Amino acid sequence: MQVIWFKKDLRTEDHRPLFEAAKHGSCVCLYIYESELIQSAEYDTSHHDFINESLAELDQSLRELGSHLVLRVGEVTQVLGELHERHPIETLWSHEETGNGITYARDQRVKAWAKANQVQWKEYVQTGVVRCLKNRDGWSRARNQMMSKKIIAVPESIQAVTDLERGRLYDQHEFGLPKNEKSRLIAGGEKTAHQLLDSFLRNRGQHYSREMSSPVTAHDACSRLSASITWGCISVRQIVSALRQRQEDVRQAKKDGMPTGGWLSSLKSFDARLSWHCHFMQKLEDEPRIEFENMSRSYDGLRESDFSQERFEAWCVGHTGYPMIDACMRALRQHSWINFRMRAMLVSFSSYHLWLHWRQPAIYLAKHFLDFEPGIHFSQVQMQSGTTGINTVRIYSPIKQVKDQDPRGEFIKQYVPELAGVPDKHLPEPHKMSRDEQNQSGCWIGRDYPEPIVDHLTAYRAAKERIYAVRKQASTREEARRVVKKHGSRKGPTQPSRRTRQSAS
């Protein structure tokens, strides 16, 4: 019996384990609700609902091929053991996964179980991540070669094992998860993923390069494929393939004298971000400890002892007194998605202005990001917190972000309605309104909307002083060289950056 173990690859096209297993006889298409993952701090009902939507569509697709999903709940090796007792498993087929500590430990158990039971476990690559990589030399070339390979077709048919209980979809309440109160912007499933890709490449993405930073325009201008990629409803290679075709079409149109608008620059920007997807995942693959520890050990102890639960809770619920911070956090809590620039701002604010160690905010955000991908998430959080030791220190100004990204307050007033009557000119710093202005706007600071939790300039200066006290040390520079050697991109300069940016950001 062949077992195809579906995890974060909930699709039938470009699925090599499925394609290969179908050649070898009777198959079980298995998905396991893993209790340890579901009960983890990073898991949310929104994740569960998205997965169930994807599983329902996957099951229908498999039925059209003559098979179906077999759904189980429990610890993976126990489930495999029960199946193995019923029908001896010849080969376990799956994709490689670069996940969190829970999935890493689980994979070690599966490896031991397969060896003990003489079951062959075949894992296949589905991203640009390379296992057992010594350094980043040549990584980009290997990633690009992987992305240029032919898309794997859906099997013509799958011979199913017919005498196993199929199981069913399990709702969130069966795992003790609360009812989903969020209005997700993205649905699960392979069809939705391809619809999003097509609408982005043909319509929505024309001004991606200039509209992706503002939360006002990002919802339409961004691809919104991140959750579909995370849960494997579409592969990065499928996206790259479609992107290459679209780039070719646009270049040809330009040669033919047709207007192409901003398409070429936008498609180039999108291409770069697809590469970054694999680049950041590779960091966690190479050094799993960065899920829990500072990438650069020079920053150990920098913030850990100063953690303020009061500040953290205000940040979590969007009551910091900074409109852009609060609007973004409330939007995220409502929709499970916010654009990248605003994610970076949220982490920067928690790390620098509130001086919170990155780990607890990272877990909170992971729970609310529908597209939570451990390799990208923990690498990015550390980058925005300044603990990689090699990246530019970016201290985002929450005041400047209002002026740059939402000058008319469209986004802010939607998600922070208590500021609806505040004139646009006061939205960056509503606490500076006079008493008469507060009265006229119907928003009293300290009653209807909080005072700033910290003073921006004071917090900025203190954070800059403290982090640079560490960065200028010789031991920190030596540690930075180690980090660059292990994780640094080989496309540009590899020296640790000494720049600080407050407002670019």
Annotate the PLM regions:
Residues R224-K425:
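Active-site-proximal binding-pocket segments
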Residues M1-D271, M281, T388-S505:
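Active-site "lid/cap" and pocket-lining segments within catalytic core domains
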